[in-house]
Amino acid sequence: MKTESKIDGRVKRSKKIRSDVHQKLILSAIKIIEDDNGKSGVNISAAQLSKISGVSTVTIYSHFPNLQVDLSLSILNYLLDLALHHYNVNLMNNMREKDKLNLIYKGLSYANTKFPFAGSQVYGLLMVGNIFNDNFKNHEFVNIRNNIIQNIFKQENLKISKAEFMRNLSIYVNGTFHAAVSNIDKDKEGEKIFLISSWSKVYENCSKVKLFDIS
C-alpha cells in the first residue's frame, strides 16, 4: 500500500513538472512573438525556444513533436483558457454548443486585444495561414491552420460546419478590431497601441484572400 502511494506521488509530481514546463514553453513562445512584433508569425525554431526558456530542444520536441502545429495549437488553447478565466466561466464540457461557440469566439477576440501579436498570429493562422507571408496558400501554413481547426472541433465535439465556424469567427474578431479603432479618439494611447499592434496587417491581409476556404 505504501509502495503504491509512493508511486502515485511520483506520478503526480512528474505530471506537475511536465505541466509547468509545458506552460513555460508556451509563455516563452508568446514572448518571442510579442518581442518580434509578430513579424515572423508563429514561426519559432526549437533553438529559439530553448534559448529563451532554458529548456532543451529534446524536451521541447517531446512536448511539441510537430513544432509549428503543436505550438500554435497550444498557444491558442492557452489564450482561450485565459479568456475563459477572464469571463469567469467554468470549462465548457456541459454547455450547449451555441454558448460554447460564443465563448470560443469571444475568447479569440479577447486574445487579440490581450496579446496583440501572439493573438493576431494565431488568428492569422486560422484565417489565412502566415499573415506576414505574401504566399497565403503556402502549403505548410494551410496544413497548420487546418490541423488547428480540426483539433478545436475534435476537442470540443462541435457540430457546426467548419465554414460557418470560420465565418462567425471572422465577424467576432473583426468586430473587436472595429471596437479598437473606434476607441482610438477616446484614448490618447489608443492610436499608439493600435499602430504598434499587428491588427492593421491582419485586417488588410484578410481582405485579400478567401477567408472561408479551408479545403
Q: What kind of region is each of these model predictions?
A:
Residues N112-F132, H178-S182:
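Amphipathic alpha-helical segments used for helix-helix packing
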Residues L84-N88, N130-N157, A163-S170, I193, ...:
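Amphipathic alpha-helical packing segments from all-alpha helical-bundle domains
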Residues A46, L76-L84:
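Short, basic, alpha-helical segments at the C-terminal edge of helix-turn-helix-like DNA-binding modules
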Residues N88-K114:
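Hydrophobic alpha-helical connector segments
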Residues G41-N43, A118-G124, I214:
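Short, hydrophobic secondary-structure boundary micro-motifs
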Residues M1-S40, Q48:
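Basic, helix-initiating cap at the start of DNA-binding domains
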